[in-house]
Amino acid sequence: MSKEEIIQAIKGMSVLELNELVKACEEEFGVSAAAPVAVAGGAAAGGGDAAEEKTEFDVVLKASGSEKIKVIKAVREVTGLGLKEAKALVDGAPKPLKEAVSKEDAEAIKAKFEEIGAEIELK
């Protein structure tokens, strides 16, 4: 079977079949499909210009400001937390709101909270 035939066979598979294929390959060869991601992340962190290449950010609530109720509502909306948990997060600031989010999402969350007077930091 040639590479092209294998590729054509893979193209014809459903997502469920592809998932089963990946699991079977992991078992057969004793590897994990997630391992290369961890290795690549470690290599990027060791580079000198890793800060310029950062693609994931943590959104941290530094202070709630004067509109605490609006901030609690926004925390619930962004995180999906219940009222009690959202209030505890706001009361315990500085606390992380969301972790490992894309730059666009992090900027949108920051803008939303700053609009209602909260202080947000992106890490």
Swiss-Prot record:
Entry keywords, A to Z: Ribonucleoprotein, Ribosomal protein
Any GO CC annotation of this UniProt entry: cytosolic large ribosomal subunit
GO molecular function, a single term: mRNA binding
Protein family according to the UniProt entry: Belongs to the bacterial ribosomal protein bL12 family.
Role noted for this protein: Forms part of the ribosomal stalk which helps the ribosome interact with GTP-bound translation factors. Is thus essential for accurate translation.
Quaternary data: Homodimer. Part of the ribosomal stalk of the 50S ribosomal subunit. Forms a multimeric L10(L12)X complex, where L10 forms an elongated spine to which 2 to 4 L12 dimers bind in a sequential fashion. Binds GTP-bound translation factors.
Protein name, per record: Large ribosomal subunit protein bL12
Species: Clostridium kluyveri (strain ATCC 8527 / DSM 555 / NBRC 12016 / NCIMB 10680 / K1)
Top-level taxonomy: Bacteria, Bacillati, Bacillota, Clostridia, Eubacteriales
